[in-house]
């Protein structure tokens, strides 16, 4: 798609990079060429190590991970084992959320027994979590780093009848994630402001293309959602953005 944009002479591209490190054809053949030919680049949600973009709108993933880690620490004992189910190895969101999660856990980070990657596939996350529960019979927490990994992990814990023994926390939400929280499987989710992220990304890109002043690095924010606050009005707007959207 990016190489096609270069050939067609497009003015800009909105991109959500899948890999943090720039190695490989995606950077060499696409982003670098686009930059050299004058195509403006806006990164949404994630970014690359090489700073080729003109603007970025994303959650501060270190902050999101740390927020999740601090909450997780309140649920754990000093020796409780923790496993992380992340999404795609090397993508900026996975790298930074895990780093933030470890920071938020503080001394409890030493109890992380393993980190696995589900490649943003529900079924792979479920199977990996099932294997983790079998491998570590004393496991007390599974932390997902995106919606796929979080929901897949929660499915496995629910299927095993282990929701009271193994705490599940994660990042991102969906209708199923909300239902899993209502059913007592999820103890906490850090939810991104995805609607805001996309809206601001398009808005600031238009300002940039019109030669007007625009923000180059925007943190779209996130919130901790628990069974105790999930029906607060502001939290409902994050969980059900289109149900609560008012059009004028």
Task: Specify the residue positions occupied by each region the protein language model found.
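Glycine-rich phosphate/diphosphate-binding loop of Rossmann-like nucleotide-binding domains
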Residues: 1-34, 105
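A short helix->loop->beta-strand "cap" motif at the edges of active sites that frequently abuts
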Residues: 10, 37-40, 80, 162-166
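Hydrophobic alpha-helical
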Residues: 32-36, 101, 112-114, 119-180
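Flexible loop/hinge segments that line or gate small-molecule binding clefts
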Residues: 38-63, 71-74, 81, 174-187, ...
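Structural recognition of the beta-strand scaffold that forms the well-ordered cores
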Residues: 40-43, 58, 81-85, 114, ...
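Hydrophobic alpha-helical segments within soluble ligand-binding/sensing domains
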Residues: 57-82, 96, 124-126, 174-177, ...
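Extracytoplasmic ligand-binding site segments that recognize negatively charged/polar headgroups
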Residues: 60-61, 84-101, 117-124
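Hinge/cleft segment of the Venus flytrap/periplasmic-binding protein
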Residues: 85, 89, 93, 104-106, ...
């Amino acid at each position: 798609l990016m190489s096609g944009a270069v050939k067609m002479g497009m003015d800009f591209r909105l991109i959500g990079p899948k890999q943090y490190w720039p190695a490989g054809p995606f950077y060499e053949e696409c982003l670098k060429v686009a930059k050299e030919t004058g195509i403006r680049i806006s990164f949404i949600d994630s970014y690359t190590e090489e700073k080729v973009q003109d603007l970025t709108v994303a959650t501060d993933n270190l902050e999101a991970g740390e927020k999740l880690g601090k909450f997780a620490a309140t649920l754990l004992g000093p020796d409780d084992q923790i496993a992380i189910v992340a999404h795609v190895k090397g993508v900026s969101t996975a790298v930074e959320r895990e780093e933030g999660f470890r920071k938020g856990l503080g001394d409890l980070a030493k109890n992380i027994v393993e980190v696995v990657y589900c490649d943003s596939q529900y079924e792979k996350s479920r199977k990996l979590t099932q294997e983790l529960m079998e491998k570590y019979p004393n496991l007390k927490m599974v932390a997902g780093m995106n919606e796929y990994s979080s929901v897949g992990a929660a499915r496995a814990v629910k299927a095993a009848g282990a929701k009271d023994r193994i705490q599940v926390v994660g990042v991102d939400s969906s209708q199923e994630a909300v239902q899993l929280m209502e059913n007592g499987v999820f103890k906490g989710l850090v939810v991104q402001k995805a609607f805001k992220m996309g809206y601001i990304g398009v808005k600031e890109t238009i300002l940039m293309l019109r030669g007007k002043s625009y923000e180059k690095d925007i943190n779209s924010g996130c919130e901790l959602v628990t069974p105790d606050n999930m029906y607060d009005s502001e939290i409902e707007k994050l969980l059900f953005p289109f149900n609560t959207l008012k059009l004028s």
